[in-house]
């Protein structure tokens, strides 16, 4: 045991850095179960250290079991000593001792004395504490040979063993420890035997002591094994801690190295980034340079293209010039030939002597005989020219002579000087006799030279004269040639004048014939007018004789010049100073007053307002008037005291509005410059109908969530009773109808038509706009403020209220449209759709809308109601929510066929004779009977005034029945003229009976009405004739004037005059389309009287006192690409084959409908909008104020292919809308040239010829006397449409400058529907080519 404890630390090397794991046995398991030393706190480490310190002490104390074991061993030793010891056993027991001796102490000397015997107690203590024995103390340092269990050197370098060697080392250490344990046990046994030898004991005692010692030794061995395992674990932990420290050190070094590497990497990354930035910048600069080069090249390419186009044009012009040059050369050749001939003639005539005036003899002959009198001025000019040339010739001759004389003088002087020099030279030199003779002979030579020199000027003068004469002859020949040309021109002009004279004579004869026809027509019309006036006077005499109103009185009532005597209720006596004078009101007008007095707000309202003294005001709108606003008021009980006065037209629309509509009143809170709706209330208007006094009431103010926020005190009233006003309105309408019937009764057919349309059945259509859902604003991030607008039939536009900031607005808007059931209405219901537009009030862009819904009206023509949600689509044909619409009739709808007479049933007009005395007697008898009936009906009418509305409906039914009876009577008596006249008289009597007995009683006293009937004939004219041509022309001119007023609304300019002239020609030629519009003025009678016998077939509503006379027209909602609408509007005539529409102008509807054409036989072009670039030169040009767009197409005139009106030049970022569409007929039979034109564009080799060209033109103002100029071109490729097979819908085209087509100045948005037509034309033409 002593050796076990002492040698245990020596089993492990002092510096073992091997990182091998623990043994794979129980020790390994124990090590893994123990916590790491680094994770244990200080307290646990101290406890464990004390426990390890006490364990050796406990181990040293022998347990009873160990003591028993020791006793048994001693007993065995004693027995072996008593007997003869076994040598082998002794060797075995001494072998460990021998092996331990070198480690226990140094080799003892052979002369060492033997140890002294130790006492028993000392031996016992030595046995219990073997580590204290001196002789057995073990050194701590290796002092001799290696231990037997160590296989290799003790000292090893760290980190020398590979990782795979760790398990092997652990297994080896385990084997060494296992082999060491038997040696230690052997050593213990030998030690015990020595003790036994020292203290011999008895066998009994020995046997008693052996058992406990043996047990104690076993226990000690077990504890020692456990202790050894724990020590190993601790040592292993210490080793691991050292290893951890080393690893931490290496990790720190690695981290330092890593930081250095990171720094180096960052430096390298920065360098690379800098290099990359430099390369990137260089690359971008290169890209920019390449872009600049590309733009330059593109500009060059565009310029080259334009040059190429110009070159093509120049080539064409060059060819033309070449042809002209050839013609000029031929003409020059002819002129040269004629000139040569004339020159020869002149030269031949020059040999003949000239007269005193130096003129050739043939000139006088030409003047006197050949040339006409018109050439005399030219001959005079020629004579003056000849005189001038003669004077000029004399002057030139004189100058030439002077020059020649000067030249001769100079020659003579020069010769004289030479002679003097020669004489001087001869004087100085000695002269010989020969020279003197020569000098003497020289004077004789001088006269000869003078004679030669004098003869030379004469010859030269003759040559000059002949040259001048030839020049004069040439000029004279040229003058003669010009005179011949002038003669030819005069002859041609004479022929032209003769042609003009013949045309003038034909025109004059035609005009005379037309004048005679016109005079004849005027005579007929005057005859008819006189006959009508005589009949009117006769009937008025009958009316006066019976005390009934005449036509003048009817006119007074119809046009309001004679106010009816209304039985008004007495007004209140406490009227204020600000009251309106009732005498200023029209008879059919009334005054409605709405007074907002005071509001009482609840604490909840003040809490919601966030102020105890809020500043509030109220807004409300009544009928079709603008919104009114009260003044500001502060406090929880604001006092407004504000009265709104409305002058309204008393009709059934107002009655229905007051009966079923409530006025919405909004209470706003004002905060600085902003305000918001605090509460909303509704004011019911039906209580005001029963009285003319003030109707006081309280309106509950509710918040957005329905909570009660207070009440509002108000009062309202109608200043005049509504029932008499309605009666006056009805009487006025019927008076106008009677006047129109009496005036338009010139012909029987027109009378029947006017009567049937006047008494056409009435109905009322109710249109309700309930709500919209899912609306999206065109501006991102904002909610729209929507309102709805639509137009039904010929009525004006109707719009709803504006709902601020709502994507799901709730309108509940109802509109009533009283209509006459006519064929036009039925046709409109069966073929058209109601376009409902939703606009955003906060959208600044004009012409834009949130959505559009198409509501088909066909169910209404079938007496069915329409109700449902309809999808809304924006201008880009994208869905933008839905709208709920409801349309239904007030009463049963019947088609107009049941109320109109068929063509076969209508009697033919025949000539009528003047009335005889017998007919007048019959008429008087019938009148007396009818007057008695009128008296009875007047009595009944006085009793039934309160139930007037119901009775009117019954009367209308009775009138319809009477008309049917009258028609039956007419059918039976068509052949007899007298009976036919009597029937017409009966009809007119019935008409007046229904009118006078029911309507005129309140206007005239009872004593003025006699008990007789009044016969009124619808018309008594000789025969059925066509409408007069003059009346038609006047009506058409009226249409032209009204169209131009609506279309242009300004003084027509140059282009406007051209458009009006073209339109007027079409209208006057009878090729126009009927323009349906309703004028809000009573011009039916005047139209009928001025136009001759024109039917007034519609009832017209009185004008509103708030507005001037207006003209309303049915502008069906624009749908540029609705093929069904376009097909239904096509015409067969040449002028009406195309149709132009404009969103701001009237829509022309056709008179006659034709079979819709296929898509391959027509094309539609629409010019939608226009916008200019802000940097374009057009924007800065002040001379350009208005623009329009035009294009050229084959044989169509520009008046049809240009926008109907010019618009203001758009500002920067603004877009103007034309919405000008045109359907072009491409019929293969009638318009083959147009199809060939399109085929040529598709096959054009030149890019310019294959493009559709739009031209933007500036339109000067009226006061500017300037011409229109082209400011831009836009091109559309037809080949793209042909290849894609798709129509173009609102495509933006670039507008280029005319001077430089590489510069873009704006955008033009157009649409073209021609894909099917282009495919059909291409297929047809190619088949014709290859067939």
Swiss-Prot record:
PANTHER family: RETINITIS PIGMENTOSA GTPASE REGULATOR-INTERACTING PROTEIN, X-LINKED RETINITIS PIGMENTOSA GTPASE REGULATOR-INTERACTING PROTEIN 1
Skewed-composition ranges (Polar residues): 77-86, 183-193, 351-367, 1129-1141
UniProt biased composition (Acidic residues): 910-988
Disruption phenotype annotation: Mutant mice are born at the expected Mendelian rate, appear healthy and are fertile. They have initially a complete set of photoreceptor cells in the retina, but the photoreceptor cells present defects in the outer segments indicative of cell death, and loss of photoreceptor cells is almost complete after three months.
Region (Disordered): 1-165, 183-220, 351-374, 899-1057, 1088-1146
Gene3D superfamilies: C2 domain
Coiled-coil ranges (or none): 236-352, 498-546, 908-999
A Pfam family this chain is assigned to: C2-C2_1
Residue ranges of every copy of the C2 domain listed in the record: 745-870
InterPro entries: C2-C2_1, C2_dom, C2_domain_sf, RPGRIP1_C, RPGRIP1_fam
Lineage: Eukaryota, Metazoa, Chordata, Craniata, Vertebrata
GO BP, one annotated term: neural precursor cell proliferation
Annotated segments matching region Interaction with RPGR: 1136-1326
Role description: May function as scaffolding protein. Required for normal location of RPGR at the connecting cilium of photoreceptor cells. Required for normal disk morphogenesis and disk organization in the outer segment of photoreceptor cells and for survival of photoreceptor cells.
Biased composition (Basic and acidic residues): 41-67, 194-220, 1022-1039, 1088-1115
Entry keywords, A to Z: Cell projection, Cilium, Coiled coil, Sensory transduction, Vision
PROSITE patterns named among the record's database cross-references: C2 (PS50004)
Major localization listed first in the record, in broad terms: other
Name by which UniProt lists this protein: X-linked retinitis pigmentosa GTPase regulator-interacting protein 1
Name of the encoding gene: Rpgrip1
Domain of life: Eukaryota
